[in-house]
Regions:
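Conserved H-loop
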Residues: 32
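Catalytic core of pol beta-like nucleotidyltransferases
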Residues: 1-26, 35-40, 50-105
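Short beta-strand->loop micro-motif that forms the acidic, two-metal-ion catalytic signature
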Residues: 45-48
Length: 105
């Protein structure tokens, strides 16, 4: 991963952690940015796993995506789950791919 991408991912991670605090269990980068096969215009895909998933927590994730867009003029997209939801979904095809290719932040 190049240093520019690392800085962008760190911004997203740090911003999200400051907003969600202990409610954030895991943050995983997945997709082309994690695999290293991205191209110009590729977005940054994240899985956000929360202890408790409440509307205000989802709003904090969306606010972080907007801040990312405003700062870097690039898109990020987040799948937001609570721990139980992730436990069920990680066995589905997308979850298997995320577990295999994702980078835990």
């Amino acid at each position: 991963m190049n240093p520019r991408d690392e800085a962008k991912i760190k911004f997203f991670s740090d911003t999200l952690r400051s907003r969600l605090g202990d409610n954030l269990c895991q943050l995983i980068l997945f997709g082309s940015r994690a695999r290293g096969d991205w191209h110009e215009g590729s977005d940054y895909d994240f899985v956000v796993i929360l202890r408790r998933k409440k509307p205000e927590m989802i709003d904090q994730v969306r606010d972080t995506e907007v801040d990312f867009l405003n700062r870097y003029d690039e898109l990020s997209a987040s799948l937001v789950y609570d721990e139980r939801e992730w436990e069920r979904r990680r066995h589905l095809p997308i979850g298997v791919n995320i577990e295999r290719e994702g980078i835990r932040l």
